[in-house]
């Protein structure tokens, strides 16, 4: 009898332990697969592609992949050519100003004399000549202003505080108008784009708190969900040349969850030393930050599993 009871007790204990282990593993798996988190996240920032508005030879490069202030000179394009163009335009303006003054006096004199001294045709001709010269003066002034603007834009300045990166221009090179010369990563503009699976969006709302762990680091950054993308492209549906819908074949028992971009605003920009484009793990903790002291062993294990799973 004792042997039977002992055997039954061992069996019962084994069954209970197996059930508890199954429950723990199941809860950890559900937490791992359904809680709002992703390892498909990247640091991003506002990047300005800087291109000159004029063409010419680069005469001076002032910066090399460094932090710059707004208005700081990045590089300079050949100025003498644009200086000469401005001087020529200024000379044209001066010429037409003198000519306009002469024609204005001539037209005024003929208008005062009237038809008693000359024909109406001669009076109208003088007025028409004056209007033509005034029109030419206006064009010359516009050309002068444009030449002045071109000269000013031979000096390319930083549009904002930030880091100059991917600088690929050198002194002596010829650069064309509109060609990207350098990228400027704006300071204090860093954020995280987390690509959440659609099955996890239930726990993601603007204003929710988030934890960001950069790849290869144990440091946890804090942030707030700023926005959730309103839509993503349907890659399985296109249109043919007649406008008819084309739907790709799909296996009914295999459905891959779509990923939706979630923008997360970092709490402290100054602590961010990770370049834009680097990856991270993001966990959305809800309306408040996660209290690690309240986490169970399995919850902590699930958090660690996210880094490797």
Curated annotation (Swiss-Prot):
Gene Ontology CC terms, in alphabetical order: plasma membrane
Entries under Pfam families matching the protein: CusB_dom_1, HlyD_D23
Main localization category: membrane
Single GO MF annotation: transmembrane transporter activity
Induction note: Positively coregulated with aaeB and aaeX by AaeR.
SUPFAM superfamilies, sorted: HlyD-like secretion proteins (SSF111369)
Cellular location(s): Cell inner membrane
Keywords: Cell inner membrane, Cell membrane, Membrane, Transmembrane, Transmembrane helix, Transport
InterPro entries: CusB-like_dom_1, CusB_D23, MFP_Efflux_Pump, PHBA_efflux_pump_AaeA, RND_pump_MFP
Membrane-protein topology: Single-pass membrane protein
Transmembrane segments: 12-32
PANTHER family according to UniProt: P-HYDROXYBENZOIC ACID EFFLUX PUMP SUBUNIT AAEA, P-HYDROXYBENZOIC ACID EFFLUX PUMP SUBUNIT AAEA-RELATED
NCBIfam families reported for this sequence: PRK10559.1 (NF007850), RND_mfp (TIGR01730)
Family: Belongs to the membrane fusion protein (MFP) (TC 8.A.1) family.
Chain's role: Forms an efflux pump with AaeB.
Protein name: p-hydroxybenzoic acid efflux pump subunit AaeA
Organism whose genome encodes this protein: Escherichia coli O157:H7
Upper taxonomic lineage: Bacteria, Pseudomonadati, Pseudomonadota, Gammaproteobacteria, Enterobacterales
Gene (name only): aaeA
């Amino acid at each position: 009898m004792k042997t039977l009871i002992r055997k039954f007790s061992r069996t019962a204990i084994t069954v209970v332990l197996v059930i508890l282990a199954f429950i723990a593993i199941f809860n950890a798996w559900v937490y791992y697969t359904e809680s709002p988190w992703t390892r498909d996240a990247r640091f991003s920032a506002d990047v300005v592609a800087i291109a000159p508005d004029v063409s010419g030879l680069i005469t001076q490069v002032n910066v090399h992949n460094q932090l710059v202030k707004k208005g700081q000179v990045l590089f300079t394009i050949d100025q003498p050519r644009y200086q000469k163009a401005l001087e020529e335009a200024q000379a044209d303006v001066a010429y037409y100003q003198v000519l306009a003054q002469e024609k204005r006096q001539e037209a005024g004199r003929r208008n005062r004399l009237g038809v008693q001294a000359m024909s109406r045709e001669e009076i109208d001709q003088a007025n028409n000549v004056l209007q033509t010269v005034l029109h030419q003066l206006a064009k010359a002034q516009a050309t002068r202003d444009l030449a002045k603007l071109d000269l000013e834009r031979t000096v390319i300045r930083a549009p904002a505080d930030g880091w100059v990166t991917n600088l690929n221009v050198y002194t002596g090179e010829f650069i064309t108008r509109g060609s990207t010369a350098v990228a400027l990563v704006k300071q204090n503009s860093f954020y995280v784009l987390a690509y959440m699976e659609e099955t996890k969006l239930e726990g993601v709302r603007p204003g929710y708190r988030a934890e960001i762990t950069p790849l290869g680091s144990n440091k946890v950054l804090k942030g707030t969900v700023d926005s959730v993308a309103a839509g993503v492209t349907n890659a399985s549906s296109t249109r043919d040349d007649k406008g008819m819908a084309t739907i790709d074949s799909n296996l009914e028992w295999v459905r891959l969850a779509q990923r939706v971009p979630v923008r997360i605003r970092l709490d402290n920009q100054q602590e961010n030393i990770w370049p834009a484009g680097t990856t991270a793990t993001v966990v959305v903790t809800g309306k408040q930050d996660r209290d690690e002291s309240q986490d169970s062993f399995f919850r902590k294990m699930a958090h660690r599993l996210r880094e490797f799973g």
